[in-house]
Amino acid sequence: MGQSTSKEHENARTNESKLKGESLMDFFNDRCLKQLTTAELISFKNNIPEGKELNDYVEVSDISRMYYIPKDSAVMLSVFMNMFHTLANFPLLQDSYEKVTFKTLLKATLLLVKERAIKYTDWKKYNDLKMLFITLSLEKNIKAEPLMDSSALSDCKDWKGVIRSYNGTDFDELKVNANNLLHFLALILALSRCCILNNCKIDNDVLAKSLEDFKHQALNIVRTMNPEIISMSDCLDSSITYTQFSMAVNDVAPNLLNPLKMLMEHVLYMDRDLVDADVLQPISNPTKIVNESELSQLATFLPKEIVFSRFQKLYVGRESGFSMRSFQSKVFKWMAPTILFVEGMRIRDEDDEDGDAYAVKNPRYRNFLQEYGKLKSEDQHLDTLSKKKRKLLFAVCIRDPWKVSNKDLFGDSSTKIIQLHPRQEIFDADPFKTGNVYFNTVGGGIGIGSSQPIIKANGKKYFPGNVSLTIDSSLEFGIFRHLGAGGSFKPGRLISGRGEERNSFEYRFIIQDVEVWGCGGEKELEEQVKQWQWEEAEAKRRQKINLQSMGEDRALLEMAGLVGQHQSGGSI
């Protein structure tokens, strides 16, 4: 008899806990409606399938249509469906398994856009990166045991703790499948040009056809997170930890997820409020290096107004010839910032018995090494990725105009060396040291991060900096060197974050392509930003709706508490 009574009390506590959990879910589901303006709610209702209501369940086909995900991309659809499924259960991210409704899609929008999430959760330190990683790592189709016991769930005072602990999530245990992340990032990169504004029109067919092209740049980002991944096939059996994910995004790709935020807010606009992205004309005359997909990778760390407007081709070695003279004639008239691109194939001579097999075959390379001073074998510490992937791509952002500098240096603290392939890394100029670039027309070539070479009748000698990129005067060979701190450039951001700034290595490579592209001046870029801001403000203006003509949508507004009784609508 006593056992029966005890069991009844236990069941009662469990049911009470479940009820309180459901009440919390209902509270946040209803709260999400109050975070949106009248126009946003009406627009969203207009975007869901005809005849469907906010509390109806969402099908995969709805996700495909509303978020421009190709119907034949099973991996991408699965990733997004799981993401929405996880967010639908906020704040009980791990303890609840409710299905996705159209109302919870609105909740997902709030949770993935940081500015909205801070208001929605009433938490200034809300971390949208953590929330996204949870949605990518948890599998909501696999029901697990609740992480929190009934006593914790039944204590109303602990709800703030539930939210701020992300429902007791242990981030050290979370991992994202690298293949899922590869597909996810390919879509995000492809969207970077389409979603430069929240209300840009998106061509689904064009987006679907271009996704394969963006997988190569997505792979560079994935390898940045996990250097043990070499090829796309490696992604199938590899994973990414939260530390790897967050370090890569925060340190070298801070703009990576901006297109996702734009996409999430895209559903808050009616078709009539969308604008043609005339500001985003396809890049004219793309080259082997600079094309739509490469621009998307640049946009992960450079401001969008630099990458997606007034990007002007100045010099392409394949077209104008690989010479300092051609470079000078094409580039030196540009009085605004530029980006120098250098692509090549790494020379694998570190494993040779004598370290000079290629030098024996190529006397020009042998002479270059004698002038430069090859890093000693015992100081060459290349990881597996660097050894197996020969292709290298560097970009150098320079604010100062180019000029002949046979004695002095130019370039200020904004100069950056960026590695784009096979991984992404950023090397910042030391703000306390002046001058970091030379363009030497008497045989010294181009140097970033080095002192001027000494050139005499009987030869020359380079003085590479601790972190530097050197290009010989024939634009045939290049060397990127990394010895740590002490030069005019700092060690890589990720390298430093991982505590590996003292690791020494260098990439010696045969140059295949050299390009220089001009960016707009500050005045032009400011005008572009103002134009985009005007476009978004204009969309908001057009979005205003006459509430008296809403008819059937009035019930939706009453549900959100925007109209009804003594209210007349408006935003919360």
Swiss-Prot record:
The keyword Cytoplasm applies. Residues 288-520 form the TLDc domain. Coiled coil: none annotated. SMART domains: TLDc. It comes from the Eukaryota. Keywords: Cytoplasm. It is found in: Cytoplasm. GO terms for cellular component: cytoplasm. Its main location: cytoplasm. Belongs to the RTC5 family. May be involved in a process influencing telomere capping. This is Restriction of telomere capping protein 5. It comes from Kluyveromyces lactis (strain ATCC 8585 / CBS 2359 / DSM 70799 / NBRC 1267 / NRRL Y-1140 / WM37) (Yeast).
